């Protein structure tokens, strides 16, 4: 009998995720959690499911402790992170106990006007998820953009370029260039498919529509009734173009991100000026040392080393470009107002055509 434990079985890698499928009940649970926690934007939860042939099938979810506002400090971040990890492990153990799927495939969060990308919490959390499972996703529900009846949900992953750059943790200009990392390819969006469970589908098919009562009105009477109910004056209520809070908030967020970007650019400009001054001093020192070596060569003396400037001068450290990269990516996200204002622009076009005629 052969010993199978000595065989080196290659580990099979799952293909990259191309689509995310969720059940409608799961989506309703996420919406309820985010709405009940509003206005707290630290609402997060965990996603459970399985990925099959590039399709991530999310079957269930559960809530996690919310993110605190003072969680930026190292102590609070460590304590809150351990509490969430312990809560997640306990919930997964309970799911395993009842025989449910326990594959941890990502997390969800509630956001306001998609103001999530510039937060270090989102990037660090998603990086940790994809480091453990490359097919993990971040599922976003935007409450403000879903207030007018349009369901705004997105599934994101960090791109391989960002994951490779984050692995180095240098975030210098040379690192970003070597990985071809730009603000446009920090994250990638995955298509979402929402469907009903088989039991819900069977229930919907089993429901019967109530019979429509037969009309006793004649055609002439129905026409007279319609004409009598017509309004005397024309109304343009359907062409109301109220901007709403989400558009104003989107502009405010865009202005705040622009101010933060200018601040980061100022820090980078200060570093470049300081670096130029130090390099000028180094060049002057090297020129002076070369002249001194020429005099020593005329006196048949050994030349002095030219790299002693490394002990005398210290070049300023290059600033990390992670914040600038995320802010630029958030600005690109905020400028995509056309995705959120299609109905608003349609009403404007209708008003223009009405007055033009």
Curated annotation (Swiss-Prot):
GO terms for molecular function: deubiquitinase activity; metallopeptidase activity; translation initiation factor activity. GO terms for biological process: formation of cytoplasmic translation initiation complex; translational initiation. One of its GO terms (cellular component) is eukaryotic translation initiation factor 3 complex. Keywords: Cytoplasm, Initiation factor, Nucleus, Protein biosynthesis. The keyword Membrane does not apply. The keyword Cytoplasm applies. It is found in: Cytoplasm; Nucleus. CDD domains: MPN_eIF3h. Residues 20-162 form the MPN domain. Pfam families: eIF3h_C, JAB. Component of the eukaryotic translation initiation factor 3 (eIF-3) complex. The eIF-3 complex appears to include tif32/eif3a, SPAC25G10.08/eif3b, tif33/eif3c, SPBC4C3.07/eif3f, tif35/eif3g and sum1/eif3i. This set of common subunits may also associate exclusively with either moe1/eif3d and int6/eif3e, or with SPAC821.05/eif3h and SPAC1751.03/eif3m. The eIF-3 complex may also include SPAC3A12.13c/eif3j. Component of the eukaryotic translation initiation factor 3 (eIF-3) complex, which is involved in protein synthesis of a specialized repertoire of mRNAs and, together with other initiation factors, stimulates binding of mRNA and methionyl-tRNAi to the 40S ribosome. The eIF-3 complex specifically targets and initiates translation of a subset of mRNAs involved in cell proliferation. Belongs to the eIF-3 subunit H family. This is Eukaryotic translation initiation factor 3 subunit H. The gene is eif3h.
């Amino acid at each position: 009998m052969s010993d199978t434990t000595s065989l080196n079985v290659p580990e099979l890698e799952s293909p990259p995720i191309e689509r995310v499928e969720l059940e409608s009940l799961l989506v309703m649970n996420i919406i309820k959690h985010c709405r009940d926690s509003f206005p707290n934007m630290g609402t997060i939860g965990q996603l459970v499911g399985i990925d099959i042939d590039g399709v991530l099938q999310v079957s269930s979810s559960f809530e996690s402790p919310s993110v605190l506002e003072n969680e930026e400090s190292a102590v609070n971040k460590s304590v809150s992170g351990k509490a969430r990890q312990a809560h997640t492990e306990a919930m997964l153990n309970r799911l395993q106990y009842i025989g449910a799927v326990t594959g941890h495939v990502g997390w969800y969060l509630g956001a306001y006007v998609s103001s999530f990308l510039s937060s270090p919490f989102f990037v660090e959390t998603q990086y940790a998820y994809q480091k453990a499972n490359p097919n993990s996703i971040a599922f976003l529900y935007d409450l403000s953009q879903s207030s007018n009846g349009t369901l705004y949900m997105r599934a994101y992953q960090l791109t391989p370029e960002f994951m490779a750059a984050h692995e180095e943790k240098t975030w210098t200009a040379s690192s970003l260039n070597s990985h071809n990392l730009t603000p446009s390819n920090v994250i990638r969006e995955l298509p979402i498919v929402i469907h009903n469970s088989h039991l819900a589908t069977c229930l919907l098919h089993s429901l019967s529509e109530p019979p429509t009562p037969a009309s006793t009105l004649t055609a002439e009477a129905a026409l007279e009734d319609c004409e009598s109910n017509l309004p005397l004056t024309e109304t343009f209520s359907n062409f109301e173009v109220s901007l709403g809070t989400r558009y104003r908030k989107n502009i405010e967020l865009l202005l705040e991100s622009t101010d933060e970007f200018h601040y980061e650019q100022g820090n980078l400009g200060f570093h470049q000026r300081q670096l130029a001054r130090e390099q000028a001093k180094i060049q002057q020192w090297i020129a002076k040392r070369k002249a001194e070596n020429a005099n020593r060569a005329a006196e048949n003396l050994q030349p002095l080393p030219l790299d002693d400037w490394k002990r005398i001068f210290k070049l300023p450290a290059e600033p990390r470009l992670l914040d600038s990269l995320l802010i630029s990516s958030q600005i690109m996200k905020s400028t995509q107002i056309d995705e959120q204002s299609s109905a608003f622009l349609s009403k404007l076009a209708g008003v223009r055509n009405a007055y033009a005629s």
